[in-house]
Amino acid sequence: MTNPNPNATDGLMAQDSLRRRMIGHGALMILTALLGGFGLYMHIMGGIEISPGHLITFNVPGTEAGWVRCHTGPVANGFMVIVTALGMVHLPVPEKAAKRIGWVVVMDGWSNVGFYFFGNLSPNRGLALGKTHVGDANVWSVLAFVPAVVFGFLVVGAFAELGYYGLFDKNKSPRPRHEFDIGAYGQKTK
């Protein structure tokens, strides 16, 4: 199918590139969840079984609950990034705003992935920069806490802005953002 608009702007190509990058980052976040599953396995087993009944023993730091979070949490963040990438194209988001929102969502996803892994190595689970009733702080606490808090606040604004574009923007674009979108150019998708 050819694009009926021969003067397509570079903005569509830029947003297509952003979407592909976001999907790639989301996939890598999901990959970290799978790696977290190996950490969970080795923590529970106290090592790795190389053949039936033969275990190479070693200590994997963290807690079982922490490794469960490492195995499950990044999946939600990966899906957040991928769904945002796929959904943003259906909203009348200007190119500059789309880039800013997209990268804030990606960085929030990665900061949360870091929170799960670094928090598992922290005495206070990465919930504070100092000593609290949960435990003492260390360098892992800082690495878990700071990026998650910074990007956690930024992503709230990013999703509020996306909500605005979806619900209240008066300049709703009647045209699809990409030729493969549902109903693009009056035809079914490929």
Which residue stretches match the model-derived regions?
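Cytoplasmic juxtamembrane interface segments
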Residues: T2-Q15, N77-I101
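Perimembrane loop-to-helix junctions flanking transmembrane segments
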Residues: E49-A65
